């Protein structure tokens, strides 16, 4: 029922109040004992009616560009990891039974060394110094930025509705170029168009939302909806 509500209300994800998001360890799927329960900020709290007359409250993350921000060790990545796993249904006792994300959402991260085969990366990568054509790009050993650009294009082809991105596992030069760096390296000398320059078009023209964890760069505030 909640998955249907996401579509109806133009939400990409829902996380119920009282959910236990941290895991016992990095290699365990069991909930962390005595963990702090999740509580939605009032400004984003919604109620969803369940079958048989019950209802559940929690955070509803709308379509568009959403930032998850906060200090270190405050659970930003833990929330994103829970949303990543929210494409699956969870068994009772998992702690994330009511963490629900659209089933076609895609985690996007840098994958240094991955292969890329015949992808048009010109949306992000262009005018390479070696003259290599990025409209049909192949490599057996992609850099972090190239691999993440490839992930975006593969997501578009797969018709994903939402990218889930953590600043910590991304290639910095793929996500953003600050104003100082733009002055040091002019646009005609930089072959990478950062994700921040495309994130609005991805939503407004293609219908792909983004949920992004940010802890060190405030650049995405200017393009975020939430």
Language model features: what each stretch is:
Residues 1, 144-152, 203-208:
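Phosphate-interacting basic helix/loop segments used at nucleotide- and nucleic-acid interfaces
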Residues 1-34:
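Long, basic/Gly/Ser/Thr-rich N-terminal segments
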Residues 19, 73-74, 111-113, 167-170, ...:
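Short, ordered loop/turn segments at secondary-structure junctions
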Residues 22-57, 92, 100-105, 109-116, ...:
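N-terminal pre-Walker A segment at the start of P-loop NTPase domains
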Residues 56-88:
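Glycine-rich phosphate-binding P-loop
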Residues 114, 124-145, 176-192:
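Flexible beta-alpha connector loops of hexameric P-loop NTPases
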Residues 135-170:
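Phosphate-binding/switch loop-helix module in NTP-utilizing enzymes
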Residues 156-199, 203-204, 216-225:
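Conserved P-loop NTPase nucleotide-binding/switch module
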């Amino acid at each position: 029922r909640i998955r249907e509500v996401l579509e109806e209300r133009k939400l990409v994800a829902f996380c119920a109040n009282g959910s236990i998001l941290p895991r016992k360890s990095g290699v365990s799927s069991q909930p962390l004992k005595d963990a702090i329960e999740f509580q939605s900020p009032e400004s984003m709290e919604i109620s969803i009616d369940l079958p048989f007359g019950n209802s559940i409250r929690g955070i509803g993350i709308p379509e568009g560009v959403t930032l998850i921000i906060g200090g270190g060790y405050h659970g930003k990545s833990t929330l994103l990891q829970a949303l990543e796993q929210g494409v699956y249904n969870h068994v009772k006792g998992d702690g994330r039974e009511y963490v629900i994300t659209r089933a076609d959402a895609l985690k996007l991260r840098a994958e240094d060394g991955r292969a890329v085969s015949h992808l048009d990366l010109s949306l992000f990568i262009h005018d390479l110094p070696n003259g290599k054509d990025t409209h049909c790009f192949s490599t057996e050993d992609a850099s972090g930025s190239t691999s993440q650009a490839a992930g975006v294009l593969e997501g578009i082809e797969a018709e994903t509705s939402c990218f889930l991105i953590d600043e910590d596992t991304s290639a910095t030069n793929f996500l953003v170029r600050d104003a100082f760096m733009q002055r040091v390296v002019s646009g005609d000398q930089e072959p990478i168009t950062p994700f921040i320059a495309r994130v609005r078009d991805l939503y407004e023209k293609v219908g792909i939302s983004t949920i992004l964890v940010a802890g060190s760069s405030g650049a995405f505030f200017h393009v975020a909806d939430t």
